[in-house]
Amino acid sequence: MLKDVTLGQFFPGQTPIHKLDPRTKLVLVIVYIVALFLAKWFVSYAAIAAFLALVIAMSQIRLKVVLKNLKPLLFIIILTALLNLFYGQGEPIAQFWIFKITKSGIQNAVFMVLRISLLVAGTFMLTYTTSPIALTDGLESLLSPLKKLRAPVHELSMMMSIALRFIPTLIEETDKIMSAQKARGADFESGNLLNRAKALVPILVPLFISAFRRADELATAMECRCYHGGEGRTKLSELHYQRRDYFAYLSGTALLAVMIVLRHFGL
């Protein structure tokens, strides 16, 4: 299950999506999320799915890799779908005890599954096609107006970038610890949910120790390279918008406009 989590991983490439300015991709992710929450009916979700499919195809990321992210969230997706299924309004189609299934409940459950799936797949494309360094530069550039309010923009961007970068590392470390515990007779897959949760307790201590050790090593490495925050720092290469970035902004604006029109007509 842990191996299916690919959040924070970067897949290098030279595709049009990889070459986009990180600021462009950050803004487009926000536009994508807004467009997704504007979706009201199957036509709207189909339009967003088509847009996402185009992005995935252009980035040359395998669809299997994108879909793997949904597996760890399967329990949450099913639970959310059931909550929407049994608490819909209208005439019941079927009823069991206090639970009733309505037409609106079925629609809401399907839409919620689509919304979560498209949201996860779409937002993960940002880390797949953007390196941690580029992501930090993009965030810092977009948040630069906050520097006038004396906000630590560079430090915040660096923290977010490091957090994303360490997610795959911690997942890999957890998998190694679990494999070592299994070799000693530990069982993480049998029993009820409470027993499985108790079986995970012995993993936490070595995982925290490993995380603190890696954090200390990273801090030492940054100090050795004379890193003292963003004040007075210069960049090897500055961010500049290219023609493809303006085309991407135009595509995002078009998607948002289409979603507004579809929502207006109830589609």
What are these regions (language model features)?
Residues 1-44, 48-57, 144, 148-151, ...:
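Transmembrane alpha-helix interface motif
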Residues 14, 37, 61-65, 96, ...:
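Membrane-helix interfacial "entry" motifs
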Residues 25, 64-74, 248:
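Alpha-helical transmembrane segments and their helix-start/interface "positive-inside/aromatic belt" motifs
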Residues 41, 45, 60-64, 88-96, ...:
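Transmembrane helix-loop junctions in multipass membrane proteins, especially transporters and channels
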Residues 51-61, 76-79:
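Alpha-helical transmembrane segments and their membrane-interface exit regions
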Residues 73-186, 193:
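Juxtamembrane/interface alpha-helical elements of multi-pass membrane proteins
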